């Protein structure tokens, strides 16, 4: 009899415009992993979606690499594993696919290495590997989270924000935009006054969300100075999507993570017509309504 670890890991959207590398929200698109020990001589992978089939099956596989990294940190050996994978999180689109895989890898190492990590420790590990908590924190906990990683003390602090009472639309282009390429578009330095201005906007936006003032929050989400002005030109459809969203009185249109996916906070009474208008007019993308995920990663052990 072998135990199967089943994981359902949500997607995430980072930044919400002005919360660069610090704010993220979990979404109901999922990476599904089913993991069990194998009698083979190496790790095995079974992919059930076309996008995952492009992933490596050797030791360069990201999940394998992270799981072994975690196992080594806690001085445990992992058995050879068979991982079945199905994902509806598009790769390299700004929806946290790498963060979902990272969290999955930590859970795999934790279970098959019998490490007994708490969720807090999972967060610390994930952020240390990722470098910032904006995707991994909501992936682990669900909901909308603001966080800070101190790279000196290696400590991550997070705070939960009320789930926004808005409809969320994602407009997903057909092309990829690697995070590394998107980061190269950013300036190396900001002036002190620029940093103060952007920080003030971000702080006020969070307060507006906490007060459920979505008019103000949306207005501020679109005034980022940290990354949006330098990345929007990488997404050919951004201006058209923002124009259509504005015509439907949306609260905000921003880049999801590093892009190229575009995130819209919509009024609930307008979201259906808005998503249909986007699909009619922006034919190089697929737009869809996505629920905010409130539970984070789900783990289940199946006994066979």
From Swiss-Prot:
Transmembrane segments: none annotated. One of its GO terms (cellular component) is cytoplasm. It is found in: Cytoplasm. GO terms for biological process: threonine biosynthetic process. It is an enzyme of class 2 (transferase). Keywords: Amino-acid biosynthesis, ATP-binding, Cytoplasm, Kinase, Nucleotide-binding, Threonine biosynthesis, Transferase. ATP binds at residues 90-100. It comes from the Bacteria. It catalyses: L-homoserine + ATP = O-phospho-L-homoserine + ADP + H(+). Pfam families: GHMP_kinases_C (PF08544), GHMP_kinases_N (PF00288). Its EC number is 2.7.1.39. GO terms for molecular function: ATP binding; homoserine kinase activity. Pathway: Amino-acid biosynthesis; L-threonine biosynthesis; L-threonine from L-aspartate: step 4/5. Belongs to the GHMP kinase family. Homoserine kinase subfamily. Catalyzes the ATP-dependent phosphorylation of L-homoserine to L-homoserine phosphate. This is Homoserine kinase. It comes from Staphylococcus aureus (strain bovine RF122 / ET3-1). The lineage of its organism: Bacteria, Bacillati, Bacillota, Bacilli, Bacillales.
């Amino acid at each position: 009899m072998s135990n199967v670890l089943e994981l359902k890991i949500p997607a995430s959207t980072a930044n919400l415009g002005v919360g660069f590398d610090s704010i993220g929200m979990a979404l109901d698109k999922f990476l599904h992993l089913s993991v069990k020990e194998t009698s083979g001589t190496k790790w095995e992978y079974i992919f059930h979606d076309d996008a995952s089939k492009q992933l490596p099956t050797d030791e360069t596989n990201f999940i394998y690499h992270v799981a072994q990294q975690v196992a080594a940190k806690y001085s445990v050996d992992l058995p050879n594993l068979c991982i079945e994978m199905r994902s509806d999180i598009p790769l390299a689109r700004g929806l946290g696919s790498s963060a979902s895989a990272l969290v999955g890898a930590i859970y795999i190492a934790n279970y098959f290495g019998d490490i007994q990590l708490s969720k807090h420790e999972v967060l610390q590990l994930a952020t240390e590997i990722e470098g910032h908590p904006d995707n991994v924190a909501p992936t682990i906990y669900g909901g909308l989270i603001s966080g800070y990683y101190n790279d000196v003390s290696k400590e991550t602090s997070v705070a939960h924000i009320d789930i926004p009472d808005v409809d969320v639309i994602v407009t997903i282009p057909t092309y990829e935009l690697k995070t590394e390429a998107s980061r190269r578009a950013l300036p190396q330095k900001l002036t002190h006054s620029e940093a103060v201005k952007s920080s003030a906007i971000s702080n006020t936006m969070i307060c507006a969300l906490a007060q459920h003032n979505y008019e103000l929050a949306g207005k501020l989400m679109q005034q980022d100075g940290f990354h949006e002005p330098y990345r929007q030109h990488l997404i050919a459809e951004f201006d058209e999507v923002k124009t259509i969203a504005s015509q439907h009185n949306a609260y905000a249109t921003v880049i999801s993570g590093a892009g190229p996916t575009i995130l819209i906070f919509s009024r609930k009474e307008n979201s259906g017509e808005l998503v249909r208008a986007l699909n009619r007019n922006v034919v190089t993308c697929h737009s869809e309504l996505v629920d905010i995920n409130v539970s984070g990663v789900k783990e289940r052990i199946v006994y066979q």
